[in-house]
């Protein structure tokens, strides 16, 4: 289980028991800058994900050692070959920025875990880089803990996501709207190759760099395409794009079933792996509202709940634009193929959403009545705005003594007639999610040095399908009116 660290654990492991690879840094020097983390005055390991450390093949006790903490801050070069800041571009709220990059982040390198999967180890809040654009490159403890908490909850919910290995406090005081304790969050992902990475490659290196990046991403994320298409050519890259579309469609469909609002779906926050990244302004809805917006910087609702599939389709169109020269033997052929493929995203998403909602309702996705039941369910959700998590878990535990939720009285008998699989529903619909009011309370207390609420919430949301005795308060939505004024912030 992921827990705050115990300072009494042994710390006498000076030698790094592993070595990181530097595949991305070595293959793409034109997209990276060698860098190191900034020195920190009083670093302390605040939270360590022991299970993830073991999956990576790293001894948790070594990570607790002084050498391990230095590694987690980007200061210990021993296990690494080359730490780098990555360059990328991006559309931010629809506006193209040609040079973004890791303004407060470092890629330490890649490591192959005990499961055989190659993953990045990446820092956030480790100090200024060449991409900082005047910012201080640091992160506050609260946002670092939010990323740890929510990303691990998403993993437990079965959502493709980056994960968090650790949070290290730095001993610095950093200025935001007020003075806050500084921290570094250590993120783990199957890669950090973004739509924005391809945009950057396209404008800085043209077709050759775009092809190399696509081949790297294919080898890393979709290796079966290498076997199917051993030679570079339009079919290889078209199938790569289709795979990315499917991965993103499945991810956003799961967001929509769970009531998750990402909040900042820029192209630099869209990974070709399909993993969810960047939890700064995210939120889980209590009441179902298709117009739900929580991010303080999303003033026009571009990334509201109901827009998320549309925005990801738009982001994927931007990816397709960078790959047009690879899609066909002529420019016109590349454009035609790109448009043809992009036009399929809506159907890919709708199929993924149908499968997700069918699973959530315990229904056979292929049964003739399922589509109608799902359509009626969504219409009732829009009309009555029930608490998303409570409603779905209530259905999962249905019995003859259950009282139909308000507005669902006529729908329930139709649903029961389809013989829903309640056992599988209980493995699909969580008891606990990181509800906004609980997250805010836990983070506020942890920043003040009181860790009990954070530890309790972390334990519940990383085992979300198991009801725990005496934890009823963690199942309930926030106070009346809380969501009407609640706002999230990027933490930058």
Swiss-Prot record:
Family membership: Belongs to the SELO family.
Cofactor(s) the protein needs: Mg(2+); Mn(2+)
Root EC class: transferase
Originating species: Corynebacterium efficiens (strain DSM 44549 / YS-314 / AJ 12310 / JCM 11189 / NBRC 100395)
Disulfide cross-links: none
Catalytic activity: L-seryl-[protein] + ATP = 3-O-(5'-adenylyl)-L-seryl-[protein] + diphosphate; L-threonyl-[protein] + ATP = 3-O-(5'-adenylyl)-L-threonyl-[protein] + diphosphate; L-tyrosyl-[protein] + ATP = O-(5'-adenylyl)-L-tyrosyl-[protein] + diphosphate; L-histidyl-[protein] + UTP = N(tele)-(5'-uridylyl)-L-histidyl-[protein] + diphosphate
Entry EC no(s): 2.7.7.-, 2.7.7.108
Keyword entries, A-Z: ATP-binding, Magnesium, Manganese, Metal-binding, Nucleotide-binding, Nucleotidyltransferase, Transferase
InterPro entries: SelO
Gene label: ydiU
Record's function text: Nucleotidyltransferase involved in the post-translational modification of proteins. It can catalyze the addition of adenosine monophosphate (AMP) or uridine monophosphate (UMP) to a protein, resulting in modifications known as AMPylation and UMPylation.
Residue numbers binding Mg(2+): 269, 278
GO molecular function, one term: AMPylase activity
Residues engaged in binding ATP: 101, 103-104, 124, 136-137, 187, 194, 278
Name of the protein this chain belongs to: Protein nucleotidyltransferase YdiU
Active-site residues per Swiss-Prot or TrEMBL entry: 268
Any Pfam family hit: SelO
């Amino acid at each position: 289980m992921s827990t705050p660290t115990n300072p009494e654990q042994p710390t006498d492991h000076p030698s790094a028991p592993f070595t990181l690879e530097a595949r991305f840094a070595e293959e793409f020097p034109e997209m990276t800058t060698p860098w190191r983390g900034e020195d920190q005055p009083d670093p302390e390991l605040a939270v360590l994900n022991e299970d993830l450390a073991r999956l990576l093949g790293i001894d948790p006790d070594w990570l607790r050692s002084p050498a391990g903490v230095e590694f987690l801050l980007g200061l210990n070069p021993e296990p690494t070959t080359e730490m780098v800041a990555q360059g990328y571009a991006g559309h931010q709220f629809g506006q193209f920025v040609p040079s973004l990059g890791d303004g407060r982040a470092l890629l330490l390198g890649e490591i192959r875990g005990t499961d055989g999967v190659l993953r990045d180890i990446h820092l956030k809040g480790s100090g200024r880089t060449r991409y900082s654009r005047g910012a201080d490159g640091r992160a506050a403890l609260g946002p670092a803990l939010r990323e740890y908490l929510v990303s691990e909850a998403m993993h437990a919910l079965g959502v493709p996501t980056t994960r968090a290995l650790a949070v290290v406090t730095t001993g610095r005081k950093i200025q935001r709207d007020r003075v806050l304790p500084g921290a570094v969050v250590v993120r783990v992902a199957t890669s950090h190759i973004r739509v924005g990475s391809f945009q950057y490659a396209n404008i800085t290196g043209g077709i050759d760099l775009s092809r190399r990046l696509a081949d790297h991403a294919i080898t890393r994320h979709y290796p079966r395409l290498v076997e199917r298409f051993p030679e570079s050519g339009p079919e290889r890259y078209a199938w790569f794009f289709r795979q990315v579309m499917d991965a993103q469609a499945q991810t956003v469909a799961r967001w929509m079933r769970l009531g998750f609002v990402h909040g900042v779906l820029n192209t630099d926050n869209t990974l070709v792996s399909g993993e969810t990244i960047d939890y700064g302004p995210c939120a889980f809805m209590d009441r179902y509202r298709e117009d739900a917006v929580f991010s303080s910087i999303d003033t026009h609702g571009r990334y509201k709940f109901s827009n998320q599939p549309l925005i990801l389709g738009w982001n994927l169109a931007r990816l397709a634009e960078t790959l047009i020269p690879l899609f066909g033997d002529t420019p016109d052929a590349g454009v035609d193929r790109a448009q043809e493929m992009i036009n399929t995203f809506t159907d890919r998403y709708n199929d993924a959403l149908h499968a997700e909602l069918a699973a959530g309702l315990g229904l056979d996705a292929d049964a003739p009545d399922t589509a109608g039941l799902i359509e009626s369910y969504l219409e009732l959700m829009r009309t009555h705005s029930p608490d998303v998590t409570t409603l779905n878990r209530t259905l999962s535990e249905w019995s003859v003594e259950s009282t139909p939720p308000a507005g669902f009285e006529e729908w329930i008998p139709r649903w029961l007639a389809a013989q829903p699989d309640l056992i599988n529903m209980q493995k699909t619909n969580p008891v606990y999610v990181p509800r906004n009011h609980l997250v805010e309370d836990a983070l506020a207390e942890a920043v003040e040095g009181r860790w009990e609420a954070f530890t309790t919430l972390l334990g519940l949301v990383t085992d979300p399908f198991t009801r725990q005795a005496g934890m009823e308060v963690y199942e309930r939505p926030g106070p009346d009116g809380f969501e009407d004024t609640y706002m999230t912030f990027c933490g930058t």
